[in-house]
Amino acid sequence: MNDSRNRGRKVTRKAGPPEAGQENHLDTPVFQAPDASSNQSAVKAETAGNDNRDAAQGAQGSQDSQGSQNAQGSQNRESGNNNRNRSNNNRRGGRGRRGSGNANEGANNNSGNQNRQGGNRGNRGGGRRNVVKSMQGADLTQRLPEPPKAPANGLRIYALGGISEIGRNMTVFEYNNRLLIVDCGVLFPSSGEPGVDLILPDFGPIEDHLHRVDALVVTHGHEDHIGAIPWLLKLRNDIPILASRFTLALIAAKCKEHRQRPKLIEVNEQSNEDRGPFNIRFWAVNHSIPDCLGLAIKTPAGLVIHTGDIKLDQTPPDGRPTDLPALSRFGDEGVDLMLCDSTNATTPGVSGSEADVAPTLKRLVGDAKQRVILASFASNVYRVQAAVDAAVASNRKVAFNGRSMIRNMEIAEKLGYLKAPRGTIISMDDASRMAPHKVMLITTGTQGEPMAALSRMARREHRQITVRDGDLIILSSSLVPGNEEAVFGVINMLAQIGATVVTGRDAKVHTSGHGYSGELLFLYNAARPKNAMPVHGEWRHLRANKELAISTGVNRDNVVLAQNGVVVDMVNGRAQVVGQIPVGNLYVDGVTMGDIDADILADRTSLGEGGLISITAVIDNRTGRLLERPTVQTSGFSEDAKSMMGEVTELSETTMNDLAAEGENDPYRMVQQLRRKLSRFVEQKWKRQPVIMPTVIPMTAETTHIGDDEVRASRESL
């Protein structure tokens, strides 16, 4: 995303006033239990919704993977919110932000598909019962209502993103009506979300309560932990943000793109901060980015440990290992609840050290005869430092490519996290003019992103660099699930050119920033928590993490498996699931946030996969009879299919004549019948499911010439 595009984006609706009836009760809890009457009404509505639910509504990726059925009500939940590896029939539903329901859009929108889901009702769940699976302990069948009133002197915890998925991390802690937020990141869209730039946490449940937020604490500077901060600040711009030096620098740069000046407060591993009822102590954590912090959050309800993203690298490049002694001291104090990184809980053993990568890079770069291009995550300063050291040892200059890489390395060099001899780092323009064996390029594009620098090089579309036979390409990163096709596509294009591509499968050019199961056991044994809540992972990771906690002595009933929106209350030293709030996705699309829902994504997918058929029929407004033959236009069809569109025209004409013979002259009902018949015909004939867009225009028999304005006006009226 370029700078101008970022600056142009805006929040479509700012934080609104308190809920109706609460104007004079600003200290009411964020969530309250519905009264009995509203509960009964909600149950009835839910039952009706289940009876009429579209089959696709029941698909929820993560729970399907566990063999459990989805018990969510179609009226207030979105499908497939828990698994990144989803098909087009198992897409996440978006949460609308327009404050009004759109359940009837499928019927009222003349251009919509006939059998689409409806049901996004805005961010508030007022009075509705949100039925989901309970993920507490081994119980996967209990249905959860909306949570009751927050317990007095109890700690409430819920995630608005980042649990049951990897990305858009955001966890809220609530004590006595005050809120503390930990992290605020983004998730990047999958192929099932066309046209979406970013996916944000759902701010809806706290949007009207942001005045109660005492601070936003950020564990580290990765996009899935800081990327949504500018969007949150558009709802309240003075939230204090606590983070380490390097993390704050990345946040400041990101907010500058949005023309924001956030309230930034620097902390480190020795800091001890009081924010409202929350006492926050910090401890050093090792990850794949500098200055990571773990949290120890203390309230009268107890002590909570949040690991953030963590690994146990015993020989870290910066000499700053994860502070296990500090974690052990917290354990001596008594840890009531531990939120632990689950990303690599399914991988046995321990992860490798970043120090193990440096010798491999030095050898590969030293042996290379032509240009070397290394692709890495733009925030992995340690990896970039190892690459720069390898280039210096081989008498090569280094150039950074990719906007995020250039920005992050400028920050890292300015703050002293990246070190290179004077004159080593040069511009891309200078690099393009040098002999290939004298240059090393460090670029973005490890995941095959179409517009990333490495992908453009592979397609030979890069403005400054042309990859040649004999060049060495090092992919120094992990392969994110779901990106395999894109990454292998880039590798194949580079191989076709004649370049040599080295990945983590070929040599030790990458190590994970997340601890394996053996490292998580160390964490649990050091902290000795009474309760555990796995976070930062998909369901397979969360369940594996649960078993690790149990193996170290945590009572099975005290391990809480939650997904986004599940509310956990910690009272008297026991953490329990008490309900769930509606949490969906906020999509950033162009200049807006949140105006996309499941229907829009379904339309975009149908357009991309099935094409478009547009039918315009002009009828006598009294008799309903056609005044001229229907006009059919198509988009996205092959020439062979277009040649058969005469059949579509004939069917349209027959359908309209039959309806008129039955006395039908209502354009809306005619549109519905026409769409239904054409959809069935096209699917049977060509095995396609295009967007069918019929338009029926009522006119007097004397007026048969129809202009574009009349067609447009008729579509809008329908």
Swiss-Prot record:
It is found in: Cytoplasm. GO terms for biological process: rRNA processing. Residues 55-91, 100-118 have a biased composition (Low complexity). Gene3D superfamilies: 3.10.20.580, Metallo-hydrolase/oxidoreductase (3.40.50.10710), Ribonuclease Z/Hydroxyacylglutathione hydrolase-like (3.60.15.10). Zn(2+) 1 binds at H220, H222, H287, D309. Belongs to the metallo-beta-lactamase superfamily. RNA-metabolizing metallo-beta-lactamase-like family. Bacterial RNase J subfamily. This is Ribonuclease J. The lineage of its organism: Bacteria, Bacillati, Actinomycetota, Actinomycetes, Mycobacteriales.
